[in-house]
Curated annotation (Swiss-Prot):
Residues 29-49 dip into the membrane without crossing it. ATP-driven pump involved in endocytosis-dependent polyamine transport. Uses ATP as an energy source to transfer polyamine precursor putrescine from the endosomal compartment to the cytosol. The gene is ATP13A3. Its EC number is 7.6.2.16. The modification Phosphoserine is found at residues 98, 817. Belongs to the cation transport ATPase (P-type) (TC 3.A.3) family. Type V subfamily. This is Polyamine-transporting ATPase 13A3.
Length: 1226
């Protein structure tokens, strides 16, 4: 096998990686060991930081199949390296490892073949992960996932559970009987312990890991260097600061580990009952569960310790831990195609597709429904970190790096500082050699330049603004689990919103119903709760077709179901465990009308009277429920009226879907027109259908019948019209975002015309804007995929800006040409099906549609995630605001995902708002902008601080002098740290503005700002340094120098002079040092004021009272000790006395410096706002962002947007680069 081979694991997935094989080389290891000794351990540190260097330095390439070590590199933009050691799992060591047991193979690496002759589904057994001769399996662990060697694909692959490649039929036929004890033990050997092990590292381990951070190693190097130069006080101060920083970091990291550990520990070890092949029930610990175990769900509920598919019974589950949605969800058993001859056929089981039948790890089972003697059973499909909760925990434990231009530019800037330090390093060596300085002193002073140029406090200073922003967000009810994303939120220029519960109220009000009789719509009716309708099929559907349940006596479930059930005023009763036990079958949920609604006599003949009627009692039992599926956009139930021989099937859902499943002759001919009339007004419309089932369908047959056998050939019954009002604050928030030039997009699962109406009503689409509906059709019957373009236009303005009023907002299709379209704004609207077709067959059109796509309706959860990715691909910074239930993927994928949830923190989203209002979005963007500008300010200040101090030291090195220990201490602690941590306290500006903050440090205006301030500070510092030498009283300073007495200004205490003789050898005390110290101290404060930006992104600096007080105090203190020297202060700071006239001269230099610095910085700001856009427009510079470049192209494209009533077809196969030929048919 080729030793230079490279393979890909997790291909096509988010964690796709390249893999290389290596074997340990003894001679390389010996050379590295020698290098470690020669470098005093530094080489070992370097190899610790760089895993790829470590592997390449100690190993040689080898075939992946036979290697001892694997080197992994992610294929994303970060190209991160990891290494892992190959381990061997010996199956022969297990007591059950007999030839017979070894022949029982795992289907697709996971499923046990319980038959003697494995089918095609079972062709991949355990042997594909092992070598047949020794029965040993080679594997490695990366990010808590085990990857086993697969002989079939000649690559490493992670061991899958029953969640992939297993059909629904196979679930029942091959796995529902349970495992033998031997096979259970065998699988446990492979899958390991079922736990999401979040081990809280020991303090010592965390300490070592933290201390070995390059930043602290550099600080350790600095402290050792300063100590050798007898800068003990400054070195001690840095040590104290580092200890405080390390302790604080350790506390924070350990606290996060403990919180995460406690979150997963709730279900880590519980006792569960499992069914074995011989039908015995065995009680085991949840940690011993393996895929294939049949778990018995207890009657009183439990916290799920794994992912399991329900095969018997019904469960009410709270999934708030995963989704943030507190509404209980009903889970039913997985459909069994093998027992239903009318089913459409078998399908592969998938936890996401079949999530209504899957119990997810960490969720709470509240109640169960069961048959006596037939317990509620679920088959374990995934364990440990493979579960849905395990994957979430992994995303927290091993987050992807934050790809943000600011951080990339910061590293480049640090490299620039290192280069500057290198110049100073060389200059110091040359200057010292020319002055015949001792070798030891040369080495110390040269290295000292490096420690000055790269400021040790930079990382802490950069995070200060984020920490303060996080605290401010917490005060307004926004919680964050990813603080680094706060800065990124400052760059958001597009926000996607879910509709229901986000833009609109959670609750829907029943506006009315419109029933159908004889395939014709009756007049709309407002009141459903009346005697005339109580026994109609329409009301029976409302009473039964829902997923409501009683929890602790309170009716709970989906808000939409609750509103419908409350509207009819019926009563729901559920059987108790005792009542169920008295029967040989599960007791159904029963609904019945209150007595006052039941008519005393037979209703009029024109009412629907298909239901069997009892004179005394009328109630309906819900026999079987097919829960709502967002993919299918419908739900259905099978019910029976008490005393009736036949059962009834009821269905409700999206009108278009329901109509397609009904007999065509029962659907009114004007169905589409009536539906559009309601949806264009912003109403949410739900259709109902019904049919009588055959009498041969018994109770038990219904429990095993497929969904498709029920949901067809229905009778269309009519429409329910729900009014979904906008939240009061929605229009104002969207208006604020529009004023700030932040695009808004609606992503909803609702009807498209309803979504367009709501978008107009809330101001997302202005009345004068055009709406283009893209209807994409997939290839069919040899015809290529195509897109039909329809134009919609609003004739009247919205009736009320804050609610979807009952007055009509009619929408008409525009068929005439729109010559003025280029002069108006336009928006694209499409549904989820069209979006998927366009992604697959019209990839060239996707960027164009993303530029103006505003309404995306009927979107499934995975389509929402794809939309976020498509928007990011054209360089938008995308925010997403949703309820956390169906938006988990999109919330995590967006640059800034914010979930509206009552929970303080949700793993579903980086940000969580306790206030269920989109007002959190502008608040988050404002704080993000403030934090971003703070980071820029702090970085610029720290860069200037290092350059100013670097130049001060370089100047003094030229006369073989330096800053004193306490001078360093005063500058770094009293000035720099105080200024950095107070200048970061500026709150966010009170409103969003159209201007956007810069995204990186490498920009013309920002670089000019920094370079101009560097030149100014160097210039004035040089002026003071060389001018002091020209003074008539100047002389080379020595302990007996007395320039002050020469001018009669001040008499120094002679004892003070005598005490300074011990410092002569360092030449700290001299006139140049004193001059440079005073001027540079003022310069730090000057650039702090110049760089402390206020509006439009932060409050003015004069409102930052801590900063103002700190700067004034420092100014007054430095000015006082400069103009009126205090002997004790001068002695500590090693300042010499200079004539009063020179002190005044230094003050003038400082004042002029301040004037020039602040004036130049203000000019740079004005130049950026006024001249830069003009310069860019004159130069016709190509925008960096793809969407801006695309917008320029489309302005001159005569074929875009598509003309009314045209069709775009995809011609030929999609090419490798994703392009396709487009033809437009008028």
């Amino acid at each position: 096998m080729d030793k230079e081979e490279r393979k890909i694991i997790n291909q096509g997935q988010e964690d796709e990686m390249e893999i290389y094989g290596y074997n340990l080389s003894r001679w390389k290891l010996a050379i590295v060991s020698l290098g470690v000794i020669c470098t005093g351990g530094f080489l070992l540190l370097l190899l610790y930081w760089m895993p790829e260097w470590r592997v390449k330095a100690t190993c040689v390439r080898a075939a992946i199949k036979d290697c001892d070590v694997v080197l992994l590199r992610t294929t994303d933009e970060f190209k991160m390296w990891f290494c892992a050691k190959i381990r061997v799992l010996s199956l022969e060591t297990h007591p059950i490892s007999s030839p017979k047991s070894m022949s029982n193979k795992l289907s697709n690496g996971h499923a046990v073949c319980l038959t003697e002759n494995p089918t095609g589904e079972n062709r991949h057994g355990i042997s594909k992960y092992s070598q047949a001769e020794s029965q040993q399996i080679r594997y490695f662990t990366h990010h808590s996932v085990k990857y086993f060697w697969n002989d079939t694909i000649h690559n490493f692959d992670f061991l899958k559970g029953l969640d992939e490649g297993v059909s629904c039929t196979s679930i029942y036929e091959k796995h529902s009987a349970g495992l033998t004890k031997g096979m259970h033990a065998y699988r446990k050997l492979l899958y390991g312990v079922n736990e999401i092990a979040v081990k809280v590292p020991s303090v010592f381990k965390l300490l070592i890991k933290e201390v070995l951070n390059p930043f602290y190693i550099f600080q350790l190097f600095s402290v050792i260097l300063w100590s050798t130069d007898e800068y003990y006080y400054y070195a001690l101060a840095i040590v104290v600061m580092s200890i405080v920083s390390i302790v604080s970091s350790l506390y924070s990291i350990r606290k996060q580990y403990v919180m995460l550990h406690d979150m997963v520990a709730t279900h880590s070890t519980v006792r569960v009952s499992v069914c074995r092949v011989n039908e015995e029930i065995e009680e085991i610990f949840s940690t011993d569960l393996v895929p294939g175990d049949v778990m018995v769900i207890p009657l009183n509920g439990t916290i799920m310790p794994c992912d399991a598919v329900l095969i018997n019974g019904t469960c009410i589950v709270n999934e708030s831990m995963l989704t943030g949605e507190s509404v209980p969800v009903t889970k039913t058993n997985l459909p069994n195609p093998s027992v239903d001859v009318k089913g459409i056929g078998d399908e592969l089981y998938n936890p996401e597709t079949h999530k209504r039948h899957t119990l997810f790890c960490g969720t709470t089972v509240i109640q169960t429904r069961f048959y006596t003697g037939e317990l509620v059973k679920a088959i374990v499909v995934r364990t440990g970190f493979s579960t849905s909760k395990g994957q979430l925990v992994r995303s927290i434990l091993y987050p992807k790096p934050t790809d943000f231009k600011l951080y990339r530019d910061a590293y480049l800037f640090l490299l620039c500082l290192v280069a500057v330090a290198g110049i100073g390093f060389i200059y110091t060596i040359i200057n010292s050699i020319l002055n015949e300085v001792q070798v030891g002193v040369i080495i110390i002073e040269s290295l000292d330049i490096i420690t000055i140029t790269v400021p040790p406090a930079l990382p802490a200073a950069m995070t200060a603004g984020i920490v303060y922003a996080q605290r401010r967000l917490k005060k307004i009810g926004i919680f964050c689990i990813s603080p680094q994303r706060i800065n990124i939120c400052g760059q958001l220029n597009l926000v996607c919103f879910d509709k229901t519960g986000t833009l609109t109220e959670d609750g829907l009000d029943l506006w009315g119903i419109q029933r159908v009789e004889n395939a014709r719509f009756l007049s709309p009716e407002e009141n459903v709760c009346n005697e005339m309708l109580v026994k109609s099929q329409f009301v029976a559907c409302l009473a039964t077709c829902h997923s409501l349940t009683k929890i602790e006596g309170v009716l709970s479930g989906d808000p939409l179901d609750l509103k419908m059930f409350e509207a009819i005023g019926w009563i729901l009763e559920e059987a108790t465990e005792e009542e169920t036990a008295l029967h040989n079958r599960i007791m159904p949920t029963v609904v019945r009308p209150p007595k006052q609604l039941l008519p005393e006599s037979t209703p009029a003949g024109n009412q629907e009277m298909e239901l069997f009627e009892l004179p005394a009692i009328y109630e309906i039992g819900i026999v079987r429920q097919f829960p709502f599926s967002s993919a299918l956009q419908r739900m259905s139930v099978v019910a029976r009226v008490l005393g009736d021989k036949k059962m009834d099937a009821y269905m409700k859902g999206a009108p278009e879907v329901i109509a397609s499943l009904c007999k065509p002759e029962t659907v009114p001919v004007d169905f589409q027109n009536v539906l559009e009339d309601f949806t264009k007004q912003g109403f949410r419309v739900i259709a109902l259908a019904h049919r009588k089932l055959e009498s041969k369908l018994t109770w038990h047959k219904v429990q095993n019948i497929s969904r498709d056998a029920i949901e067809n050939n229905m009778d269309f019954m009519g429409l329910i019209i729900m009014q979904n009002k906008l939240k009061q604050e929605t229009p104002a928030v969207l208006e604020d975002l529009h004023k700030a030039n932040i695009r808004t997009v609606m992503v909803t699962g609702d009807n498209m015309l309803t979504a367009v109406s709501v978008a107009r009503d809330c101001g997302m689409i202005l009345p004068q804007d055009k709406v283009i509906i893209a209807e994409a059709l997939p290839p069919k019957d040899g015809k290529v995929a195509k897109i039909n373009w329809h134009y919609a236009d609003s004739l009247t303005q919205c009736s009320h800006p804050s609610a979807i009023a009952s007055e009509a907002t009619p929408v008409k299709l525009v068929h005439d040409s729109l010559e003025d379209l280029q002069m108006t704004r336009y928006h694209f609207a499409m549904n989820g099906k069209s979006f998927s077709v366009i992604l697959e067959h019209f990839q060239d059109l996707v960027p164009k549609l993303m530029l103006h796509g505003t309404v995306f309706a009927r979107m499934a959860p995975d389509q929402k995630t794809q939309l976020i990715e498509a928007l990011q691909n054209v360089d938008y910074f995308v925010g997403m605001c949703g309820d956390g239930a169906n938006d988990c993927g999109a919330l995590k994928r967006a640059h800034g995902g914010i979930s509206l949830s009552e929970l303080e923190a949700s793993v579903a989203s980086p940000f969580t708002s306790k206030t269920p209002s989109i007002s959190c979005v502008p608040n988050l963007i404002r704080e993000g902008r403030a934090a971003l500008i703070t980071s820029f300010c702090v970085f610029k200040f720290m860069a200037l601080y290092s350059i100013i101090q670097y130049f001060s030291v370089t100047l003094l090195y030229s006369i073989l002098s330096n800053l004193g220990d306490f001078q360093f201490l005063f500058i770094d602690l009293a000035i720099i740290l105080v200024v950095v941590f107070t200048m970061s306290l500026n709150p966010a500006w009170k409103e969003l503005v159209a201007q956007r903050p810069p995204s990186g440090l490498i920009s013309g205006a920002l670089l000019f700002s920094v370079l101009s301030q560097i030149i100014i500070c160097i210039g004035f510092q040089s002026l003071g340094f060389f001018w002091v030498k020209q003074q008539p009283w100047y002389e080379v300073w020595h302990p007996k120098s007395d320039a002050c007495n020469a001018t009669g200004s001040l008499l120094w205490n002679s004892s003070h002079l005598d005490n300074e003789t011990e410092l002569d050898e360092h030449n700290i005390q001299n006139y140049e040092n004193t001059t440079v110290f005073f001027i540079s101290s003022f310069q730090y404060l000057i650039v702090a004021i110049a760089f402390s930006k206020g509006k439009p992104f932060r409050q003015p600096c004069y409102k930052n009272y801590f900063f103002v007080f700190s700067v004034i105090f420092l100014y007054v203190f430095i000015l006082f000790i400069m103009l009126y020297p205090v002997a004790s202060v001068d002695q500590v700071l090693q300042i010499v006395c200079v004539p009063y006239q020179w002190r005044v001269t230094m003050l003038i230099i400082v004042l002029v410096n301040a004037f020039v610095s602040i004036t130049v910085e203000e000019s740079v700001d004005r130049w950026r706002k006024c001249c830069l856009p003009w310069a860019l427009s004159c130069g016709k510079k190509i925008p960096k962002a793809k969407y801006m470049y695309l917008a320029q192209e489309l302005l001159v494209d005569p074929e875009w947007p598509p003309k009314p009533q045209t069709t775009t077809e995809a011609k030929g196969l999609v090419k490798e680069n994703g392009s396709c030929q487009i033809i437009t048919i008028t």
